[in-house]
Regions:
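Conserved beta-loop-beta element that borders a ligand/cofactor-binding pocket
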Residues: 29, 66-89
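Substrate-positioning beta->alpha
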Residues: 63, 94-95, 111-132, 139
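A conserved pocket-lining segment of Rossmann-fold NAD(P)-dependent short-chain dehydrogenase/reductase
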Residues: 48-52, 100-119, 123, 135
């Protein structure tokens, strides 16, 4: 599959399966991938990043989001959810790896300005269910908590564990 085309294929499945008049479809992105680097500016669901993406993953998620918007324009009852950095049981994210490295003393430094809005996996699942039950087709919903820098996250981890927080470097 060409990058980003999974969205087109997934949205066509319901039509091909003969599902008539579904109340809503659900499409998930992440806040990081869709919004890319906002240069520290807090944004809401209406924000659309138009600059150069910070990674290929980021770019292809934006392509998929554009495809989802085309389905919305064709009046497919699509609801978009955008979780923040998901954490919790079963976590395989970079954040988890960084925390484990920190606990083992193998995380020497952090970018000083990198921020993230975290979302616990149970809250994320609940947000998906609410979007399916009550979400307005054509709308997007961010599922995330307050923004934190990675420095904030690891200062808290340092306070909890008693381990020295990693050094920070400009980002």
């Amino acid at each position: 599959w060409r990058k980003g085309q999974h969205t087109r294929h997934a949205q066509c499945v319901g039509v091909d399966a003969g599902i008539e008049n579904p109340q809503r479809h659900l499409h998930q992105h992440t806040t990081l991938a869709v919004n890319s680097d906002t240069k520290g500016k807090l944004v809401d669901e209406t924000y659309h990043f138009t600059g150069q993406h910070i990674s290929e993953y980021d770019r292809t998620k934006a392509v998929a989001h554009d495809i989802a918007n085309k389905f919305i324009a064709k009046e497919l009852p699509l609801v978009v959810v955008m979780p923040g950095g998901i954490y919790g049981p079963g976590d395989t994210s970079t954040l988890r790896v960084n925390i484990l490295d920190f606990l083992k003393g193998r995380l020497p430094m952090l970018p000083s300005q990198f921020g993230i809005c975290l979302a616990h996996v149970e809250d994320t699942a609940r947000g998906h269910l609410l979007a399916m039950e009550k979400g307005k087709p054509g709308e997007s919903y961010i599922i995330a908590g307050e923004p934190h820098t990675m420095v904030d996250v690891f200062k808290l981890a340092s306070q909890i564990t008693g381990k020295r927080a990693p050094l920070t470097v400009p980002y």
